[in-house]
Amino acid sequence: MKKIPHVSLLIPCYNEEHRLSKNLNKIVKFLSKKPYAWELIIIDDGSKDKTSDIVSRQAAVESSIRLVKLKKNQGKGAAIRKGVLNATGNYIAFTDVDLSVSIETLDVMLTLLQSSAVVIGVRRRKGSSIKKHQPLYREFMGHIFTKYANIVLNVWVSHFTCGFKGFESSVAKQLFHTQRVPGWSFDAEVLYLAKRNGYAVCEHPVEWTNEENTKVNILRDAVLSFIDILRIRYYSFFGYYESVEKISRKNYMTDRKSTT
């Protein structure tokens, strides 16, 4: 009988044939050294290149790799949601295929998840470091978005969009079952839902490196992201979100912020 994975690691992908194979090998090499069972779920968000073919070849060699394929491009939020609802691990984490945050961060994240419902990587607080910065205009827009989302959603976290996040499995499934935003602002929505329902959000400072080959269209995606934040408030005000049940077996009511 196959063991239940200790962790399900999700990687959303869209047209990633040029860097997927190399970074997939890095992730598998890291996970293969672990004493626990794991699964690596690659979500192909309607790619038009050979992304799925690359994953299928890897999965034929490594049985712990799974491919989840969306027929058409729906957005990062929709891809992560699909992956979470398909995951079987005790813990669920996701990161970006560019590995802008080192895969080794998963070790600390899993430790922190012993006492927190949600752990998020942040690059804008004490203890974090940026090895290679984004262009100034992108950093500026990121700061504006963080302030805007914190004010509108009353969430108050240091950073929303760092790609590395982890959850206790049942918490992830509850939050992502409720989550509705398909695009880039899904991070803010999930953290809003977590805070709204009393789950602890632990901020872990990370070392981050900007990846030049981004698929973000700064003007289009900025406008859509700002609209999505208002949409989240609209959904909440008019009762579109289902009630997320609290987990009684752990006390996640007090926020814990890691300074490691």
Over which residues does each language-model region extend?
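N-proximal low-complexity "stem/linker" segments adjacent to membrane-targeting elements
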Residues: M1-K29, Y36
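Conserved donor nucleotide-binding strand/loop of the catalytic core
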Residues: W38, S52-N86
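A conserved acidic beta->alpha catalytic loop
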Residues: D44-D53, L99
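Acceptor/aglycone-binding surface of glycosyltransferases and processive sugar-polymer synthases
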Residues: L70-N86, Y91, I103-W184, E211-R220
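Hydrophobic helical membrane-anchoring modules
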Residues: M1-H6, K147, N154-V155, T178-T260
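Short loop->beta transition adjacent to catalytic acidic/histidine clusters or analogous donor-positioning motifs
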Residues: P5-V7, V28-I41, K50, S63-R66
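Acidic helix N-cap motif at the loop->helix transition within catalytic regions
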Residues: H18-K22, D49-Q58
